[in-house]
């Protein structure tokens, strides 16, 4: 094995191994030994690469996010594209959300999401935030995260085109959201619900 861990080389193997293992059992039942053996690693190499199952979740999600960031130019397109990676790995993420490790995944999603909305603000030349705007940023992303989690945990499958429509046609624009104090997380979730009723069979 190489001295340095190259996530670009090993993460596709991790994806494949987890998908196979989670077809038979749940995430909580997986051990470092079972994951390492399915990937073809020694336990020592697994611990060097990920430290533990929590670090594996963080690295897995950040790897999927980074793949989207590298492809598109605007933050909004980046985020939409990374949602598709999550949906493509639905079995893995659904199992994690159903496990005792769910809080860790919520945390890393939330942290990534805040970076996303701040990057989008900078892209749109919104250089600073009032306290009220910062609070609404958090509501905005919590609404988006709720949509993503409900999609993964539910039976619906959103295509890339459907995700585009949700963001562009049904959720308030980012700048309008910063200005409009009446826009809340409940309003965003209401718009998502109405979209589902109209478009998802």
Question: What is each residue range found by the language model?
Answer:
Residues 40-50:
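Short hydrophobic/aromatic patch on the recognition helix
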Residues 23, 27, 31-36, 50, ...:
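Core of compact, soluble alpha-helical bundle domains
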Residues 12-20, 38, 55-81, 111:
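Alpha-helical structural segments
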Residues 93-96, 121-124, 151-155:
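Secondary-structure edge/capping motif, primarily at the C-terminal ends of alpha-helices
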Residues 1-25, 29, 34:
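Basic, helix-initiating cap at the start of DNA-binding domains
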Residues 69-96, 101-102:
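Hydrophobic alpha-helical connector segments
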Residues 102-149:
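Amphipathic alpha-helical packing segments from all-alpha helical-bundle domains
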Residues 153-201:
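C-terminal peripheral helix-coil segments that are non-catalytic and often amphipathic
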């Amino acid at each position: 094995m190489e001295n340095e861990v190259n996530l670009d080389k090993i993460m596709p193997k991790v994806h494949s191994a987890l998908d196979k293992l989670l077809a038979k059992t749940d995430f909580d039942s997986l051990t470092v030994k079972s994951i390492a053996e399915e990937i073809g690693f020694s336990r020592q190499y697994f611990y060097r690469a990920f430290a533990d199952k929590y670090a594996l979740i963080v690295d897995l999600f950040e790897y999927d996010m980074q793949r989207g960031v590298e492809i598109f130019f605007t933050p909004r397109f980046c985020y939409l594209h990374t949602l598709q990676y999550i949906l493509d790995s639905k079995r893995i993420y659904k199992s994690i959300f159903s496990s005792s490790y769910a809080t860790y995944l919520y945390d890393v999603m939330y942290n990534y999401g805040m970076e996303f909305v701040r990057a989008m603000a900078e892209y749109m030349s919104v250089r600073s935030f009032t306290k009220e705007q910062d609070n609404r940023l958090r509501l905005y992303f919590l609404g988006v995260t709720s949509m993503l989690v409900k999609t993964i945990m539910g039976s619906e499958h959103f295509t890339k085109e459907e995700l585009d429509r949700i963001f562009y046609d049904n959720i308030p624009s980012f700048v309008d959201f910063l200005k409009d104090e009446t826009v809340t997380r409940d309003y965003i979730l209401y718009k998502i619900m109405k979209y589902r009723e109209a478009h998802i069979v």
